[in-house]
């Protein structure tokens, strides 16, 4: 069984489905755990990130990040640059969308955000533009809606994805290149393989990190949550609800998680840096005593405070007398005698 844990960015051609690419990568690499991040329709090309091995657990994290596309909009009438740019401004920000009829999700009204909409080129009725958007935005629907606002109608003619989260077009490799890399790897030449294979922690370059102590790793491996006692440090000032990457003190990625509180609320992460321990319990002539940590004073006991007795009964003889009166075994009168004796002393006060 293969032990590949990372990502490969495939330049998906038009024609095959995203699931067919999964199958081909599975055959090429020998890794049974393969999944893609963000489905591309058969007629769409571009960045298709393949997760292998343990990286399949990180698919949802990458899928939530923004995506970038280059598309061609075909309108049914001619427009000038100013008209197109004016409509693009209306579609920048949060918009309403209903997924197209041919989609893998239910056709319900939803809100998606367009971060940037840039006009690149125009030729007759064809408009080339670039869009950076929230995950789950349908570019086909966006083109149709832009056509309605223009007045003549329009539809998507071409679409290519150029970025998914931190993976951009410059990191793409064809299926043939991926196949060649693994064939050369099996022959001992890993140069091309190292060029196309991306480790898991690449996606966390801009994420806040939580560095845990070695003593916490066993519990984390069993799925336990992380508590302040197991944290060595936090970088990036994450807020409640933020996704964080969990690293060891040796900079090894071991888990991901969600912050339950703000980083500045973990007040007991490291409050006091201890220089000297002053409360060690030692042994001095058979009696427990507090001993100073400093070796120069190692054998010098610290005087314990005098034990205070109940009420005003400070003298040992007085305590014994009172105890005898209250203890039938010592010739006293029981609890009643002790109570009455205590009330008498209380009255004298």
Curated annotation (Swiss-Prot):
**What GO terms are given for molecular function?**
RNA binding; tRNA pseudouridine(55) synthase activity
What InterPro entries is this protein classified in?
A: PsdUridine_synth_cat_dom_sf (IPR020103), PsdUridine_synth_N (IPR002501), PUA (IPR002478), PUA-like_sf (IPR015947), PUA_sf (IPR036974), tRNA_PsdUridine_synth_B_fam (IPR004802), TruB_arch (IPR026326), TruB_C (IPR032819)
Q: Which PROSITE patterns match?
A: PUA
Please give the SMART domains that the UniProt record associates with this protein. PUA
What Enzyme Commission number does this protein have?
5.4.99.25
GO BP term (any one): mRNA pseudouridine synthesis
UniProt-listed NCBIfam families:
CBF5, PRK04270.1
Give the UniProt family note.
Answer: Belongs to the pseudouridine synthase TruB family. Type 2 subfamily.
Q: Which protein, by its recorded name, is this?
A: Probable tRNA pseudouridine synthase B
**Natural source organism:** Picrophilus torridus (strain ATCC 700027 / DSM 9790 / JCM 10055 / NBRC 100828 / KAW 2/3)
């Amino acid at each position: 069984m293969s032990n590949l844990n990372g990502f490969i960015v495939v330049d998906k051609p038009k024609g095959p489905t995203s699931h067919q690419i999964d199958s081909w990568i599975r055959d090429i690499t020998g890794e049974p755990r393969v999944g893609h991040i963000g489905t591309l329709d058969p007629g769409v090309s571009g960045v298709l990130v393949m997760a292998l091995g343990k990286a399949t657990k990180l698919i949802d994290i990458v899928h939530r990040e923004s995506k970038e596309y280059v598309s061609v909009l075909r309108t049914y009438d001619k427009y000038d640059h100013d008209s197109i740019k004016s409509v693009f401004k209306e579609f920048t920000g949060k918009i309403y969308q209903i997924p197209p009829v041919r989609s893998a999700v239910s056709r319900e009204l939803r809100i998606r955000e367009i971060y940037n909409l840039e006009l690149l080129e125009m030729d007759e009725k064809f408009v080339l533009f670039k869009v950076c958007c929230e995950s789950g935005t349908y570019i086909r629907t966006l083109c149709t809606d832009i056509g309605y606002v223009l007045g003549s109608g329009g539809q998507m003619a071409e679409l290519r994805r150029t970025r998914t989260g931190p993976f951009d077009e410059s990191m793409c490799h064809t299926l043939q290149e991926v196949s060649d890399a693994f064939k050369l790897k099996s022959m001992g030449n890993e140069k091309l393989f190292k060029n196309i294979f991306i480790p898991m922690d690449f996606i966390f370059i801009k994420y806040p990190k939580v560095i845990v102590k070695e003593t916490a790793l066993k519990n984390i491996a069993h799925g336990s949550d992380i508590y302040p006692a197991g944290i060595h440090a936090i970088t990036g000032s994450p807020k409640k609800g933020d996704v964080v990457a969990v690293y060891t003190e040796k900079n090894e990625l071991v888990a991901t998680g969600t912050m339950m509180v703000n980083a500045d609320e973990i007040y007991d992460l490291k409050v006091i840096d201890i220089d000297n321990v002053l409360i060690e319990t030692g042994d001095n002539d058979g009696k427990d005593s507090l001993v100073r940590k400093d070796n120069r004073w190692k054998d010098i006991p610290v005087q314990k405070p005098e034990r205070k007795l109940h009420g005003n009964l400070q003298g040992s003889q007085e305590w014994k007398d009172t105890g005898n009166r209250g203890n039938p075994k010592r010739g006293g009168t029981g609890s009643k005698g002790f109570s009455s004796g205590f009330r008498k002393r209380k009255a004298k006060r």
